[in-house]
Curated annotation (Swiss-Prot):
Cellular compartment(s): Cell membrane
Organism name: Mycobacterium leprae (strain TN)
Gene Ontology MF terms in the entry: phosphate transmembrane transporter activity
PROSITE patterns: ABC_TM1
Pfam families registered for this protein in UniProt: BPD_transp_1 (PF00528)
SUPFAM superfamilies: MetI-like
Protein name: Phosphate transport system permease protein PstA
Family listed: Belongs to the binding-protein-dependent transport system permease family. CysTW subfamily.
GO cellular component: plasma membrane
Amino acid sequence: MNLDTLDRPVKAVVLRPISVRRRIKNNVATMFFFTSFLIALVPLVWLLSVVVARGFYAVTRFDWWTHSLRGVMPEEFAGGVYHALYGSLVQAVVAAIMAVPLGSMTAVYLVEYGSGPFVRVTTFMVDVLAGVPSIVAALFIFCLWIATLGFQQSAFAVSLALVLLMLPVVVRSTEEILRLVPDELREACYALGIPKWKTIVRIVFPIATPGIISGVLLSIARVIGETAPVLVLVGYSRSINFDIFDGNMASLPLLIYTELTNPEYAGFLRVWGAALTLIILVAGINLFGAAFRFLATRRCSGCR
C-alpha cells in the first residue's frame, strides 16, 4: 500500500440537506411531545402549589410535629399530627415486615427455581393482585380477620390489608432486580461446586440488595397514603395509641377524612396541613430510596 495514500486527507462528503418537509414534521412532533409534557406537568404543579400554600402555616408550627390532638377542641387550632404520623408509619412498617420476606421469597422462586405452568399462574395472580383496589383488600381482611375470626378493629388489621397491596410491588421489583444479576456469576459458582441456595444467599442477594431495598421503600410509599383500609379496619383517635392490636389509631389519611367534617377554620388548616405532611412523607421516602440506590451503586462501582 502506498504511504502517500494514507497521508492524503480525506475529502469532505457533502450530505444532502434535510428537506423543508422533514424539518416541519420534526418540529411539529417536538412541539407535540413538549405540549403533552406541559399538559401533564400543569396539574402536578397546580396541586403542589395549592397544598403548599394552604398547608404551609400548619407544618411550620413546632407543635404540629410534637403533639397530638388530645384535649384540643374542634374550633381550636392547636396540637399537631404526631399521633397520626406515628400511626401511618407503624402501619406501613408492620406491613413491610410481613410483605418483604414473603414477596422476596416469591420472587426468588419465580426467577431461580420456577418453571412450567405453575410459574405462569403465579405471575398471573401477582398481576391480578396488583390491580386489586384498596377497598377490596380492606373488605377481604374485614371479612376474614374481624367477621370470621372475631378479632377487633385495630392497626394490625390495617397492616394486613396493606400487605396485600405491597406484595405485588415487592414481588415485581425484586424479580426485576434478580434478573439483572449476570448469569455468569451464577454459573461460576456452580462450576466451583457451590450449591444453588448458597449462591443465592452469598452472591445474588448481596448484589441485588440495593435494588430490593429501593423497591421496598417504593412499596411503602405506595401504601402509606391508602385511605380505604383505615376507614374500614380501624377507628380514629385524637391521641396516640402504641398498641397495634387493640384500640383505635389515627393515621394521616384518616385524620384528613375526619377533619373534613369539621366546619371550623381550624379543621381547614388541619386538613391541608395533614395533606402537605403526607406529601412530604411520601417524597422523603422516595428520595431516601433514590439516594440509597445511588450510594450503593457508586460504592459497588468503586469496588470493581
